[in-house]
């Protein structure tokens, strides 16, 4: 019988002479959960997905129409390596409207999703002696990107007493002459928490490059998201269209960077990626110009789901110390039920047929927690939580 708790090393044996940094990378566990869930579905099992951070909405109609029109207009060739100038102007205008900051369109690199932006920044900033400060827990892939750039991840615990927020003093203590950058993410994955103005001002003053992942901006239900560019122009901003506009499959993101870095970033972009999809870029222009009402509609639906899920999880015995303010995740304390979030997540999948993400996927600081995604219909969320509740009852909780 297949052991779903295996490390998957047998499946992923590599050649003898491979990069040791790659061997240090951990699996993206949520993808392992999804892979097993898909296997169960192929066997006829009805699985409810509360694990994957992907909007369940279709792209806005204006986005689909723009993509189709781009094909009809034969806009299927390479664009400028930094991205279509019209799209970069729209991104700059968006940052002016949203945050009151002036962004030079020539300081924007359009990428195939925001993940290439992470790679571009780290390849620019890092060498084998570099250190990059990350939160623990934090987005699972940051650490592996740092390893891919031959650098060392330095993990700073989030403070449970402070609502799973970054502690600026803990960061300050980790800054050394080798620090190449500090990753911040707001709203945060997996916690959904916003970084406040005081923190952003403080971290911007440390004299270290800040890499600010702002991909969940636009999906904020309480408070206001601030861009790091409101406090410094020496930062690197990662953003994109996947979450806000539900455009995950179109793979469109962007990087905003200091002007002094642009030529180096352009060389990296030219050599590694050439350019982002011309079709997706046309769709991005339409999204920024016309999709605000679609985003507002999606946000209202997410918020309804968020409120329901928070209430229901608490009834079930999960502890939610601080309610998430944005994104579409709830990071719930499951230590009443388990000390092994990996095993717990797969047990829930196998027995309740609901996919959830183990907290250990986000670092050792996430152990004992599980992440629930409310990027699914309210009907599916209700059914999924019913199944988990029944499973926990069978286990004696």
Model feature map: region roles:
Residues 4-14, 24, 28-46, 54-70, ...:
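PLP-dependent class I/II
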Residues 16-19:
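Extreme N-terminal starter segment of soluble prokaryotic enzymes
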Residues 77-78, 216:
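Intrinsically disordered, tyrosine-centered linear signaling motifs in cytosolic regions
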Residues 78-111:
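Conserved N-terminal alpha-helix of the aminotransferase class I/II PLP-enzyme fold
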